[in-house]
Amino acid sequence: MAHLKINGLVQIRSTNRSKHTRASQWKEAVIEIVERKQKVNLVVSFKLEERRRVFQLGDNVTGVVVSGELGLYHLDLTLRDDTSLLIDKLSSADVEHLKSFLDSSTPCESQQPMEPMSSQDDLESSDPFCGEHQEAACGSLNTTPESGTPLSRKMPLSMSNTTGGQKRGEKQGRKRKTEPSSSSAEVNKDIPKENTPDQKKKSRRYYSRNRGGKAEKAVTLREQEKRSNWKLEPAFNSKSYGRANLDGTILPIATCSDDRDVSIFGLEIITHNGVQSLPDPYLNQLKREGFPNLGNTCYMNSILQSVFGIPTFAKDLLTQGIPWEKVSYDDLIMPLSQLLVLKDIRDVEIKGELLTSVKKSISTVADTFSGNEQNDAHEFLSLCLDQLKLNMEKVNAMWDTERRNTCAGSAGTKRFVCPVGANFEFELHSSIICEGCGEATIKTEVSNYLSIDLHHGTKTHPLSIQKSFDLFFTPEKIEHNCEKCKNKNSVLKYTLRRLPRVLIVHLKRYQVTTDLLPVKSEQPVEISKYLNISSHCHENRKLPFPLANTSPDVSQGMMPGIFNQSMLSKKVISESCDPMVLQVGSSVDAEIQSFQIMYEDEDASEEQQQRGLESGSMLEPELVKTENRILRQKTSLATDSMMGDGYSFLPMLCEPLSIQDPGLAEMGLQEVPENPEFKNYEKINIYGKSDGRTNTELSKLYQNHGSRIKGLFLPASLASVSSQEDPEKDLSRSPELQEDDPHSFAFGSDDSKDGEMGDDLQNYRLVSVVSHFGSSPNSGHYVSDVYDFQKQAWLLYSDVQVFESSDPSIQENRLNSGYIFFYMHNEIFEELLKKASECKVLSTSKEEKRDIDYFSTLLNGLTYILEEF
């Protein structure tokens, strides 16, 4: 038998005499299948521990279940002694090979079973075990546990509605219901099939200790690496607050707890040769990574991705010159800003530490977020915005006090704009008019979101976000004691007095039953692409804050100020065209700081960058805290995990930088000419002189004879590197990405009016949707669809995984799950879209930039020598 060796995440489970299941931690390991003395063994060698475990295969195997979702697969191997070996995060090729080896090593079922033989070179006594256990795989190797239908030994990868012994789902005070996966079974996710008595018994056995049936496991961050061909790094153990409440248990493995909703991301299940499998999805998984799940924190990840996807919010938070050295790390604004800067790096450990700090900050005001339980995304959003607003008030108060003490008698002091108030805050004007005397009671409320009721629609008039929004502003008769005439009949009417840049609409999908239990309504609601609010505005309405036409003041708020020196001295490189992402490094091809990417020459020497970082800010010891220890230590690892595909949320700042602080000039920043057509290829020659004419000729020379020059001058190491494909070519090939096509999305019935609504000043356009899959706020899974301005396409964020939809259909896939909707003012949307189209300075790939850098230095030097002669 050929030798097989693959990498994966492994968990070993065993059942003791008391029928209690013990499960080890998930660990990175090398899985090998070897044949010794006519016996086939599976050897698990743990990477971080000098030990291994050996499991005999053959007739010792009682069940093999392969399952997966969105390109990731896991295999559940069950042995006769009730030991289960779970191998997760496998690629399709690895799981095919492993399944083939396991099938070929299993004797015919007609043979007499032998006694279970499971040996090990080293006991796993050091592993902490937990009381939680997922369903084990039962049945023969070639039989699906659900239906008993024989499968071919060379069967394709199974993508059944249930995951076999590893059923993914939630438990809401009822027994599990599974669906058969045989070819004769019709896939119907709305009608769950009943379990057989044996299956029910096993479900009770393995889920009796499930605390609330949480939707996701408390995982180490490295478990969420997407591909096995990526190098697996040591697992990061995130801090867990309130862990004592878990009673020594871990949560079951799942990413979605709704056992009925199989294709939650719009993936259809097809039947092929009697086995349900996954077709090529329309979702294109990107190399970029989202936020790791710390254990039921998908609600936090989805909200943060949606908020970070608002370019104006990012600009207001990062470009005002906030004195970060004065901000406490315990305040939410600090880890939130750091996370925004580093959102697109691949190192999940750094992002995991920052997410833990964000969670801890929110937990100080709401204990419900201190544990590992699933929480409501809307509640987290509300608390997050409130805390951020309070932090900005604290910064302004501190800044005013300091300026008054240092600049006594000055005319005025600078106040920082609150990103929450400038982007999400609106004024809701309510008037209660007495029907008897006409006396009006006026009140104005300030809010960050609008919660609307979920009404019932009909087949002929289906419910939509627009219709629900209109119903909220419909005058309503209420009982109100009039102080003037004592009449109790009044009319309540709402109007919008001040409009926000981004209107957050919260759809009330949860209702409380008579037993005081929250129940989610899955009533379909069509998602309106445009939201027309013109008829609901006050006569003296105030338009949203316009986009600032002046250059941002980065004299004190440049990105290095958010981090301490020890962290910045290490390499933090995010290969992203995100203008807000910190890009610091000493390598030859590392770009300069994030804002320089759009305004400045793309190159800076290592000495210039390091000097700039050291002079950027002298942070107080307040930032050098224990909570930031791992962040500082692990920053150097970000170089190896940098972004490769260069997607971003928007280079929204295209105007030249206005440098006001002389100290900033020492950071290697120079003012860019105001000509927007100025080429980004201008370099600094080796003698420190800038020659625009030479660099223009360099650009033409490289464009016309680039391939020939590469062969003549490039070292072998560089010449052998093939250039990556220009991202702009992808845009030219994809008509739907070239322009903002109002008909490129399959939205609801309101879209017939989209063309007429587009130019209305009171129209808002959808830019993000947070969806919940599940039947309870305490379980399920949250995802977020965010419009990417740079790519001009929709991106789906599901924790660490990021997908691009080539043919988006948000209306179809979020019909029953859409929960929170972000609508941007159409005028601002168009302006940001225009700026994003103009900002194309990062269209060159990493290898092409390296080549240009090399030629720039070489040819500039040659030009200088020729001029001297």
Curated annotation (Swiss-Prot):
Residues 289-826 form the USP domain. Deubiquitinase involved in innate antiviral immunity by mediating 'Lys-48'-linked deubiquitination of CGAS, thereby promoting its stabilization. Its EC number is 3.4.19.12. The lineage of its organism: Eukaryota, Metazoa, Chordata, Craniata, Vertebrata. This is Ubiquitin carboxyl-terminal hydrolase 29. Residues 104-120, 140-150 have a biased composition (Polar residues). Residues 104-226, 723-754 are annotated as: Disordered. PANTHER family: UBIQUITIN CARBOXYL-TERMINAL HYDROLASE, UBIQUITIN CARBOXYL-TERMINAL HYDROLASE 29. It comes from the Eukaryota. It comes from Mus musculus. One of its GO terms (molecular function) is cysteine-type endopeptidase activity. GO terms for cellular component: perinuclear region of cytoplasm.
